[in-house]
């Protein structure tokens, strides 16, 4: 319950292309159903110019400002019901890092009509699945149930949107749960500690530099008043998006939405999501985490770049293709050079974190084989980047990237829950339904010049570097003999 989506390369386009393949697996967070042929899906990438993602999607807005998105899918008598709030850790008041995630925990503590535990019990008794997650830009809750239980799911979510009951008796022990979660998932994991430190030195001025789970000292200070204030400001219908995918009709959903969410009044106007901008990187920023528990050393390099939301024109799609050419898949330049040809690395790749409300990140990573070093990895990554900057990319590389990306998007439509998550995350990070639906045609329009332009514009400066190292225990100095000690004193 309540996994945190700590910032990592797994946002909008990157998720759409690569990670949505994993959304087809039952083990995925959203617990998707078995894969069935998607209605109207065409797996031929050559049709991408006219391809529209979820063409039967419809959307409407209630009088209280709640946006509702409906994605009919009649292949199985089940529905995925998700509610997305346009608030995440980057929207937290100063000094209250972790309150967004803390409130996510507290949302399961009940209302007057549905006390602590009743919500989850009702879902379990009906054979359903539920979960929730917090990121820097949004907080989401979902249930997956047989379609006849959708009215109950909407009633339960609407109830806790308006009637959450909190007390010190509930808040205090849950704060201890979150602190223990931090100890287990961050403090005890060298890789998580490095990611947290790397975020902090990448975003010094922007709140993306604070961890989603929060800093320990600030979690310890969170209380009932902080949670209620956050809830009252942001958990209001005009700051939320409901996405329902499955065996339903738009007419039925509209009626249910009016009867449940439609009765909730606006509690607040959250206001425009204005955040401090990150100044251009100057000088070198480098962090290393050494720990005896590290099993495999690795190095990462990161640049702050435009996201799908902040990038103009074809910049986001060009960055995505650049990441694919350089480091995604066995035919990518980094993998082929470092892993296959030179056999100096166990893994090597690139990513583009595009699905953020503000700027995203572009990065490289590599893990050396035994007998090779992180310094060697860094030099070889720089060499491959320089080759691309000076020699360009080929039409074949661009086409291969486009075909793979679009094919993944086509097959991803087989996942009911995956589509619900895709549109929910997009609509809470500054994008529109049209942005998502027409993404394949935007990818097809990218040119070689577009890819080279973004490479030369955004990867020309020094990256932020993170190193994960195996800590070698320092052997204690050998004890001096009595004769040696006497000799040293003379």
Model segments located where?
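Active-site SXXK
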Residues: 97-111
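Short, polar/flexible loop-turn hinges at active-site or ligand-entry regions and domain interfaces
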Residues: 109-114, 161-170, 393-394
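Non-catalytic beta-strand/loop surface segments
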Residues: 40-89, 114-149, 185-238, 263-309, ...
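Bacterial N-terminal signal peptides
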Residues: 15, 19-35
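N-terminal secretory signal peptides that target proteins for export/translocation
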Residues: 1-18
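Short pre-active-site segment immediately N-terminal to the catalytic Zn-binding motif
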Residues: 88-96
